[in-house]
Design a protein with these regions (language model features):
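Charge-rich amphipathic alpha-helical interaction elements
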Residues: 1-142
C-alpha cells in the first residue's frame, strides 16, 4: 500500500456517520488496529531502508575518499583527489545514493502520516461523545 492509498483509506474510515454514532463508536478499536498494523509495517520498512541507505553511503564514502578496493575503481574509475570537505558534496549529489535517500524520506512521510492518523483515531471517541452531547443539548435533554 502506498501513501495515496493510505490517505484514501483514512478518508473513508475516519468519516463519522452522524446518524449511527453508537456504531461509529464501536468501530473505533478496529480502525485503530488496522492503522496500527500499517504503522508497524512501515516502521520496519523504514528501519530496513535506513540500513540500506547507510550501507550504501559508507560504500560511496569509501569510493570518493579512495579507500575502496581496487576492483571498484577498475569497474568505475574515479581519478579526482577530493578534499575531506568536498566529500559530503559528492555524496549529496550522487544519483545512486539519492535513490536510497528518496526511499527513506518517502517511508518516513508515510510513518508520519500514519502517526497523525492514529492520533485522529484516538480522538475519534471524543468527537463522537461531543456529537452525542450536542444532540442531547439541542433536543433539550440537558
Amino acid at each position: 500500500m502506498d501513501l495515496e492509498q493510505l490517505q484514501d483509506l483514512a478518508d473513508k474510515k475516519l468519516k463519522i456517520n452522524d446518524t449511527e454514532l453508537d456504531l461509529e463508536s464501536l468501530k473505533t478499536p478496529q480502525i485503530h488496529n488496522e492503522f496500527l498494523k500499517h504503522l508497524t509495517k512501515f516502521k520496519l520498512l523504514l528501519s530496513k531502508s535506513q540500513i540500506e541507505y547507510y550501507t550504501q553511503r559508507k560504500q560511496k564514502w569509501e569510493y570518493y575518499t579512495g579507500k575502496a578496493s581496487p576492483e571498484v575503481y577498475t569497474l568505475k574509475p574515479f581519478s579526482f583527489k577530493l578534499l575531506k570537505t568536498d566529500v559530503d558534496k559528492y555524496l549529496d549529489a550522487d544519483p545512486e545514493l539519492a535513490k536510497y535517500k528518496q526511499k527513506v524520506d518517502y517511508i518516513q512521510t508515510v510513518v508520519d502520516f500514519l502517526d497523525r492518523t492514529l492520533k485522529q483515531i484516538s480522538n475519534r471517541g471524543f468527537q463522537i461523545k461531543n456529537a452525542i452531547d450536542w444532540r442531547k443539548f439541542t433536543s433539550g435533554a440537558i
